[in-house]
């Protein structure tokens, strides 16, 4: 028998075109089962009704979950340990919120043995044009193989050209590669990459926010790109024209606070024009895998052995500082209490709290959060980083 909570999540993943901030807010407020019931009965606000009205009577959740289980997959929700909390925390930042669709996914449909929570802290996106040149495919393969050899996961979109070259090289080097799809996991796209996507699902991880049967479309590719950027620490554009999906992924990476990098190419090549534009606007120049590894390193490697608390506070975002200042000087506080003190919604404090924990500035015990002082903070930061890498 299918778990009612899983069935509710599966129903909700189909009822609105993702990402739907209003639907996510309802789920945070009342939980997935109650949210699904309200949506199904049409007992939601006008704004959410506009997003769900056309599909609320479509319930394929049981069939969707059975298909997922037959394929050996899993539904990853924000309640699961595998949910990449730190990676998706970036969607609470101002850069993401300023962009259309700048929201965390509701759920993820995933196939493959690699866990997202373990992969994302040490991953790099290698992306580029479908109409790649021999030069571009050679460089993409060389970079991906080098990353795989250095235990860095390679994230891409499964497309022809640069994406495919990166995925194949990572697999051939016995590394981990991640494919983020713009449609249901049961619709291999492009069809010519069916075998490649199958290999990724066997040895890495393939995931999508779209339920089975949903076909890729142009707007879904652009929406998907935010997840390619989110689950990587850096986005490297190998080849791209002036108007390309890879440039869109780079824009998402910048909005999410990730490192944006590009590979230079011949000045006469239109396939490198987008890369040269990125480089002119401050992207890091990449020519070898070691350049990317410097951007990606383990979280625990980003700080010195003895970080100064003052310096750590200096680099906090506005939301992270609000949450830090809402923590009590003595004792501990619940998520709801921190939300009240910071002026943020409960869901908006989760990402900043994860950042504070990794930075050794806060810790959670028995569901309550407290400030950490310098000595304890260093030990806690190492423990938090160890759980993430």
Curated annotation (Swiss-Prot):
It holds the Pfam family DprA_WH. Belongs to the DprA/Smf family. This is Putative DNA processing protein DprA. Induction: Induced when cells are grown in human macrophages (THP-1 macrophage cell line). One of its GO terms (biological process) is DNA-mediated transformation. It comes from Mycobacterium tuberculosis (strain ATCC 25618 / H37Rv). May help load RecA onto ssDNA.
